[in-house]
C-alpha cells in the first residue's frame, strides 16, 4: 500500500478544532488499514506570525512543497489586524498558492436534502443541487500589474488594478473544467464579461477553441458573468460545471455557497498542473469558511466543510473516489438523522458540538465500510 504524505496546516481561530476532526478520521483510516497516510503539522497565518513573525516559515514551506497534499484550516482574525501588510495572516495562503503553482480552485456547491430548507431559496430550487465552480486562481485582476494608487494632487488619487490573462492560463483552466464535466453531467458554462472587457473576449475565444479541439462531446455554454450570477439565484440546478476567472469566480462561488444554507458546509480544492513524470499534482484543500474567531475554542464550529475538504483530497490527489463517496454519504446520513451544529440548527433537530459532529460522521463512515 502506497504511503501518502499529508501536511496539516490548522491555522487560526476554529482551524485547529475542525482540523482535529479530520485527524481523527485519518487516524482511523490508518489503523483500519484502509489507507496509509503520513501526517506532519505546521503553522500558517496568525499562529505563524506569533511564533516566527512571518505568515509561513521557510521550514513549513519546504514541508508543503514535499507533501502529496496540504489540508488547510483557516487564517486571520482581529488579533493580527495591525501586523505589517506583507506578513498578514492571509499572505501565508497566497504564498502557498503561488509557490505550489495552484491555478485551479474547485468549489462544489452541494445541497444535502436534509438542509434544503436552510437555503435562502425555496426547497424546490436547491434540493439535489450539485454544481462545481472552477475558478482561475493565479491570474486576472488580483495579480495583474500595474497595481497602484497615485496621488494626483488637489486631494485627488487614482487607483489602478490590471486585468491580465494569457492564452495558456485560460487553456489550462478550461481543460480542468471540461475534464471534471466528463465525470459529471457533461456540461460546462463559461462566464466572463466579453461585452465590456477585452480579457472576456479572449476568454470566450480560447475556451471555445479548447472545446472544439479537445472536448467536442462536452456541452459548452457561454454566459455573461452578471447574468450568470442572477441565474445562480434564480434556478441554480441548470448548471453543472461553471468555469470563470479569478474575480468573477471569487464572487460567483460565494453566491453559490449561500445556496446550500451555510458556509460551514462547503469544501474547496486548489490544484496545480499534473507533473509529466510523476503524474501527480500539487494540491491544497480547505474549507470555504473563515477562522470565525468569535466562536473559536467554544466547540461550536461546524467540521463538515473541513471533513469534506479531506474527502476532496481523497478524490483528486489520491484517486480514492469510492472512499470519498463514502465520506459524502456519511455526512448525508448524519444530517438526515437530525444532528446539527449551531450554524445549521433548526427547530426539531439535535444540537451537536464540533467533536460530536465529527464523531458521528466517523461512526457512519465505519458502518459504511464494515
Curated annotation (Swiss-Prot):
What InterPro entries does UniProt report for this protein, alphabetically?
IsoCit/isopropylmalate_DH_CS (IPR019818), IsoPropMal-DH-like_dom (IPR024084), Isopropylmalate_DH (IPR004429)
The positions annotated for binding Mg(2+) are 226, 250, 254
Q: Which top-level enzyme class is recorded in the Swiss-Prot or TrEMBL entry?
A: oxidoreductase
Q: Where in the cell is it found?
A: Cytoplasm
Q: Assign the protein's first listed, main location to one coarse class.
A: cytoplasm
Q: Which UniProt keywords apply?
A: Amino-acid biosynthesis, Branched-chain amino acid biosynthesis, Cytoplasm, Leucine biosynthesis, Magnesium, Manganese, Metal-binding, NAD, Oxidoreductase
Q: Name one GO biological process term.
A: L-leucine biosynthetic process
Query: Site described as Important for catalysis, positions?
Result: 142, 193
Q: Which cofactor does it need?
A: Mg(2+); Mn(2+)
Reactions catalysed: (2R,3S)-3-isopropylmalate + NAD(+) = 4-methyl-2-oxopentanoate + CO2 + NADH
Q: Where does substrate bind?
A: 97, 107, 135, 226
Report the GO molecular function annotations: 3-isopropylmalate dehydrogenase activity; magnesium ion binding; NAD binding
What residues does NAD(+) bind to? 77-90, 290-302
Note on how the cofactor is bound? Binds 1 Mg(2+) or Mn(2+) ion per subunit.
Q: Which EC number applies?
A: 1.1.1.85
Q: How does it assemble?
A: Homodimer.
Functional description taken from the UniProt entry: Catalyzes the oxidation of 3-carboxy-2-hydroxy-4-methylpentanoate (3-isopropylmalate) to 3-carboxy-4-methyl-2-oxopentanoate. The product decarboxylates to 4-methyl-2 oxopentanoate.
From the Swiss-Prot or TrEMBL record, give the protein name. 3-isopropylmalate dehydrogenase 2
Q: What is the lineage of its organism?
A: Bacteria, Pseudomonadati, Pseudomonadota, Alphaproteobacteria, Hyphomicrobiales
Amino acid at each position: 500500500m502506497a504511503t501518502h504524505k499529508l501536511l496539516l496546516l490548522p491555522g487560526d481561530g476554529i482551524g485547529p478544532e475542525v482540523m482535529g476532526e479530520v485527524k481523527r478520521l485519518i487516524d482511523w483510516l490508518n489503523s483500519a488499514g484502509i489507507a496509509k497516510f503520513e501526517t506532519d503539522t505546521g503553522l500558517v497565518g496568525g499562529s505563524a506570525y506569533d511564533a516566527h513573525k512571518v505568515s509561513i516559515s521557510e521550514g513549513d514551506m519546504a514541508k508543503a512543497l514535499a507533501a502529496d497534499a496540504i489540508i488547510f484550516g483557516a487564517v486571520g482574525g482581529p488579533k493580527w489586524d495591525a501586523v505589517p501588510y506583507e506578513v498578514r495572516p492571509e499572505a501565508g495562503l497566497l504564498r502557498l498558492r503561488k509557490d505550489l503553482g495552484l491555478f485551479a480552485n474547485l468549489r462544489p456547491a452541494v445541497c444535502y436534502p436534509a438542509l434544503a430548507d436552510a437555503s435562502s431559496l425555496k426547497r424546490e430550487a436547491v434540493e439535489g443541487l450539485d454544481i462545481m465552480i472552477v475558478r482561475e486562481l493565479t491570474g486576472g485582476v488580483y495579480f495583474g500589474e500595474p497595481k497602484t494608487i497615485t496621488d494626483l494632487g488637489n486631494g485627488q488619487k487614482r487607483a489602478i488594478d490590471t486585468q491580465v490573462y494569457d492564452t495558456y492560463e485560460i487553456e489550462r483552466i478550461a481543460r480542468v473544467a471540461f475534464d471534471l464535466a466528463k465525470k459529471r453531467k457533461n456540461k460546462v458554462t463559461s462566464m466572463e464579461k466579453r461585452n465590456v472587457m477585452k480579457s472576456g473576449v479572449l476568454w470566450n475565444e480560447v475556451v471555445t477553441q479548447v472545446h472544439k479541439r479537445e472536448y467536442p462531446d462536452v456541452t459548452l455554454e457561454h454566459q455573461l458573468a452578471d447574468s450568470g450570477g442572477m441565474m445562480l439565484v434564480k434556478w441554480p440546478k441548470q448548471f453543472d460545471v461553471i468555469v470563470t476567472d479569478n474575480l468573477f469566480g471569487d464572487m460567483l462561488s460565494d453566491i453559490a455557497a449561500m445556496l446550500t444554507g451555510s458556509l460551514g458546509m462547503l469544501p474547496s480544492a486548489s490544484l496545480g498542473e499534473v507533473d509529466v513524470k510523476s503524474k501527480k499534482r500539487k494540491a491544497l484543500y480547505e474549507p470555504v469558511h473563515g477562522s470565525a474567531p468569535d466562536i473559536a475554542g467554544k466547540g461550536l464550529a461546524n467540521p463538515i466543510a473541513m471533513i469534506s475538504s479531506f474527502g476532496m483530497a481523497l478524490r483528486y490527489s489520491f484517486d480514492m473516489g469510492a472512499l470519498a463517496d463514502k465520506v459524502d454519504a456519511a455526512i448525508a446520513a448524519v444530517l438526515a438523522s437530525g444532528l446539527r451544529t449551531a450554524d445549521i440548527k433548526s427547530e426539531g433537530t439535535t444540537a451537536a458540538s464540533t467533536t460530536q459532529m465529527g464523531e458521528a460522521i466517523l461512526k457512519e463512515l465505519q458502518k459504511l465500510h464494515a
